[in-house]
């Protein structure tokens, strides 16, 4: 049997931030209880949201970072700060083999630029 799928989550991305991302984690877990989550972002904002969803208790690791990519931030600026941001850390988790996939509701341009730099593209793409 293969290991449980691990999903890295940028909890600070999107208009609703951690509330929407943690609710999505809980919903995903209800659909597939083999999933495990690495949630990146401001722990002070994430923990209260996790407390609302007891079903994921023990299935989520929170990795704190106070830095996030703004929706208005240019991809070139975001790349320079990637290592210390929730989005950049989630992508790095995939690169480093800690996660199988990364999810972000944040700045799409920054996500694409950081992902392409960190993960490269598949052959032929």
Predicted regions and their residues:
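Contiguous, glycine/small-aliphatic-enriched amphipathic segments in soluble metabolic enzymes
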Residues: 1-117
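A short alpha->loop->secondary-structure connector
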Residues: 119-125
């Amino acid at each position: 049997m293969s290991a449980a799928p691990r999903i890295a989550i940028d909890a600070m991305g999107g208009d609703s931030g951690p509330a929407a991302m943690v609710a999505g984690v809980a919903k995903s877990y209800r659909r597939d209880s083999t999933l495990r989550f690495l949630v990146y972002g401001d722990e002070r904002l994430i923990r209260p949201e996790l407390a609302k969803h007891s079903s994921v208790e023990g299935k989520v690791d929170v990795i704190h970072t106070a830095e996030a990519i703004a929706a208005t931030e240019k991809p070139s600026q975001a790349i320079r700060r990637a290592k210390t941001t929730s989005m950049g850390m989630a992508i790095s988790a995939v690169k480093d083999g800690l996660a199988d996939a990364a999810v972000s509701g944040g700045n799409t341009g920054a996500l694409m630029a950081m992902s392409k730099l960190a993960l490269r593209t598949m052959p032929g793409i």
